[in-house]
Amino acid sequence: MKTKVAAIYGKRDVRLRVFELPEITDNELLVSVISDSVCLSTWKAALLGSEHKRVPDDLENHPVITGHECAGVIVEVGKNLTGKYKKGQRFVLQPAMGLPSGYSAGYSYEYFGGNATYMIIPEIAINLGCVLPYHGSYFAAASLAEPMCCIIGAYHANYHTTQYVYEHRMGVKPGGNIALLACAGPMGIGAIDYAINGGIQPSRVVVVDIDDKRLAQVQKLLPVELAASKGIELVYVNTKGMSDPVQMLRALTGDAGFDDIFVYAAVPAVVEMADELLAEDGCLNFFAGPTDKNFKVPFNFYNVHYNSTHVVGTSGGSTDDMKEAIALSATGQLQPSFMVTHIGGLDAVPETVLNLPDIPGGKKLIYNGVTMPLTAIADFAEKGKTDPLFKELARLVEETHGIWNEQAEKYLLAQFGVDIGEAAQ
């Protein structure tokens, strides 16, 4: 099977590649990858090349396919897997394999990654339960289940303690104060959505950022009134220019501090602020992955000793986290499409990945069977003045107030003749 992929050939070297995939073994799957949402972790891998812990050597001869937030359709089933999978079945990939090597789809494999028209899912990924049946029909939601899974996993990874009781209570503190720092970006939107609509029931959620435009957008998507209707106080704060943001933020809790803090940017000042905002037994989750292997900040160990403050770090999520993300999206409790601001085809991947931090907006969603430059949803109407494809896409997203939706996805895929398979039974 001939495939077209975006692959890492070295540091800051991402190219399109067309080649013949080998025949699958009896324990592998050949799949068509319909959609993949671009993760900042992919940019980090492209930036570092083989110096990244998950990226192997010899990229020049064996380039690795980018992308891991993907969903698609099974095209061919290995002989030993016919009782478990079938041709035409839709799937979503859970890429966190937890291997000692750190290897996973989108970083480490020549034939296994989300930015591909076709890829081979290897036996090891299948045995680890990474291929999940997808019962829905909206591939964007399936792709976005992976970033939502990471967000959900972070909430589950936090923990709290009782003095002299040597058991961790996993998850955020019920009825507690949550602070989401540097959290008005695409992943932050998902974190706010889950805090309000994920059923974890904090009493207060404070979202902190320094970008007015981003804060204004997320407030439209997730207004304070929505949170209030669920018994949650939601506060948006821009700390840019504040002389003492710590004092102001602690005042929102009566100076008690925050029980759970999530840091969504690998910026020393943000991590230090999080430390100062912790309540007694407060848990700081360092969600943002730094590219600097020597990333260090001061931390108050007096509070560690006397106030039981503590730190966790999370990367990825479990299969159960993924299933939760899919289920909450299917019921409409979570709206992962809120994160999406740009749509593009496979041809847009190299430039998108290499310039990802400099492209404004939220998640960039790629449809591999589509030829289309990366385009902001907000620009559809203007482009539609001269291009009938964008004219119809603009009309369809207008029905959901500028948010990407399943009808727009189906129209786009139909224009390029993409086979969307059938829902898992």
Swiss-Prot record:
CDD domains: sorbose_phosphate_red (cd08238)
Keyword Ion transport assigned: no
Disulfide bonds: none
Domain of life of the organism encoding this protein: Bacteria
Keyword Ion transport listed: no
InterPro entries per the UniProt record, alphabetical: ADH-like_C (IPR013149), ADH-like_N (IPR013154), GroES-like_sf (IPR011032), NAD(P)-bd_dom_sf (IPR036291), Zn_alcohol_dh (IPR050129)
Signal peptide: none
Keywords carried by this UniProt record: Oxidoreductase
GO molecular function, one term: oxidoreductase activity
PANTHER family: L-THREONINE 3-DEHYDROGENASE (PTHR43401:SF2)
Family: To K.pneumoniae SorE.
Protein name: Uncharacterized protein YggP
